[in-house]
Regions:
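Donor nucleotide-sugar binding/catalytic pocket of nucleotide-sugar-dependent glycosyltransferases
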Residues: 53-92
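Conserved donor-binding/catalytic core segment of Leloir-type glycosyltransferases
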Residues: 104-120, 126-129, 143-144
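Glycosyltransferase donor-sugar binding loop
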Residues: 142-155, 174
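Acidic donor-binding loop of glycosyltransferase active sites
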Residues: 183-201, 209-212
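Short glycine-rich donor-binding/catalytic loop of glycosyltransferases
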Residues: 196-197, 203, 212, 216-223, ...
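Conserved acidic donor-binding segment of nucleotide-sugar-dependent glycosyltransferases
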Residues: 228-229, 233-238
């Protein structure tokens, strides 16, 4: 049983799978997070072919991934949704969460959580927040951005400054330990995932665990697990 999430690992994983199957009776199964990566490279397709054609069966977590997988392999595939997490603890009182994070409990908070990469659309969210502010619809609310930057953060800092959002965006640009995750989701009124591309997202499952409504974009598998108007809202990524 193997796990696959990026073509970068395909040369190694594909070789291991072929060696394992070389005895003629061992079957290789794969729990697959992504087929096509969020940031594309010329080697993605040949690397994917090398690994995925050496696998006897798959478990996928969204129909988006299943559709991409079918372009490479006709091996049996089983759907199993992304599970909820158990390692982040239980929801705490909002007042306690605000104290822990140094937040004003009188303010409403939107939360953008997790690794900050181009495809996650933080730039879209900042532009949208600026529009809300100009329209007078962001009064009494702030945006928490919590996570490590995997792309140069200077462009986002410029965007915040250019839009006059210095007092509207609370930036916790660091790794968030498991023990602190519950405070962010307990303090938030809703979670925002303005992704430009996606398959499925662990952030969505954390929001479910802590019973926090979501606003997500209609990309990849996000809309599959966030019914519009029931547990949140689905919008276009523009």
């Amino acid at each position: 049983l193997m796990k696959y999430w990026t073509p970068f690992m395909a040369p190694c994983f594909g070789t291991i799978a072929r060696i394992a199957r070389g005895n003629g009776h061992t079957k290789v199964l794969c729990q697959i997070d992504n087929v096509e990566p969020h940031e594309r490279h010329l080697t993605d397709k040949p690397f994917n072919r090398y690994y995925l054609r050496a696998v006897d069966g798959f478990v996928y977590m969204s129909e988006q991934v299943h559709r991409e997988l079918e372009a490479y392999s006709k091996a049996p595939a089983l759907f199993s949704p992304h599970p909820l997490f158990e390692n982040f603890g239980e929801r705490v009182a909002r007042s306690e969460a605000c104290v822990r994070l140094g937040l004003d409990p009188a303010v409403g908070y939107a939360l953008f959580f997790g690794l900050i990469r181009d495809y996650k659309g933080l730039d879209l969210l900042l532009d949208a927040w600026a529009e809300l502010k100009r329209a007078g619809r962001a009064e009494g609310r702030k945006l928490i951005v919590a996570g490590e930057f995997y792309t140069p953060k200077e462009r986002y800092l410029r965007q915040i400054a250019d839009n006059g959002l210095q007092d509207d965006v609370i930036l916790h640009d660091r790794f968030i330990p498991d023990g602190q995750v519950k405070y962010y989701f307990s303090a938030a009124d809703f979670v925002v995932q303005p992704y430009k591309t996606a398959t499925q997202s662990g952030v969505t499952q954390i929001a479910y665990q802590f019973c926090v409504p979501m606003v997500v974009t209609d990309v990849g598998g996000l809309a599959e697990i966030v019914p519009d108007g029931r547990v949140g809202y689905v919008c276009e990524p523009t």
